């Protein structure tokens, strides 16, 4: 029989928020007796946008903005019904996107 595994992917704009969320997930899963691998930091995606500062004069004057998306990966092995219930009941901040597979 194949071992049951849950893969949790976290995405957020704030690095402190994603690290706190990952630690709370790991702590709640370890209480149920499951094995945890992670949080594994994935590459940060950076999107840069360049805009012109003024609409008419100084066309060479530009300003750059960037948006960073931080990602973490957590693998959970030996999943029990208590593990899934603890993940369902876990309250995470609004700025963190969670994907379960």
From Swiss-Prot:
It comes from the Bacteria. Keywords: Ribonucleoprotein, Ribosomal protein. The keyword Ribonucleoprotein applies. The keyword Ribonucleoprotein applies. SUPFAM superfamilies: Ribosomal protein S10. Involved in the binding of tRNA to the ribosomes. One of its GO terms (biological process) is translation. Signal peptide: none annotated. PROSITE patterns: RIBOSOMAL_S10. Part of the 30S ribosomal subunit. This is Small ribosomal subunit protein uS10. One of its GO terms (cellular component) is ribosome. Belongs to the universal ribosomal protein uS10 family. InterPro entries: Ribosomal_uS10, Ribosomal_uS10_CS, Ribosomal_uS10_dom, Ribosomal_uS10_dom_sf. PANTHER family: 30S RIBOSOMAL PROTEIN S10 FAMILY MEMBER. It holds the Pfam family Ribosomal_S10. GO terms for molecular function: structural constituent of ribosome; tRNA binding.
């Amino acid at each position: 029989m194949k071992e049951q595994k849950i893969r949790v992917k976290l995405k957020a704009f704030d690095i402190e928020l994603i690290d706190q969320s990952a630690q709370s997930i790991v702590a709640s899963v370890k209480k149920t007796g499951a094995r945890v691998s992670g949080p594994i930091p994935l590459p940060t995606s950076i999107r840069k946008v360049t805009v012109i500062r003024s609409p008419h004069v100084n066309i060479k004057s530009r300003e750059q903005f960037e948006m960073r998306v931080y990602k973490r990966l957590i693998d959970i092995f030996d999943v029990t019904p208590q593990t899934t219930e603890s993940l369902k009941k876990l309250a995470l901040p609004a700025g963190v996107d969670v994907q379960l597979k």
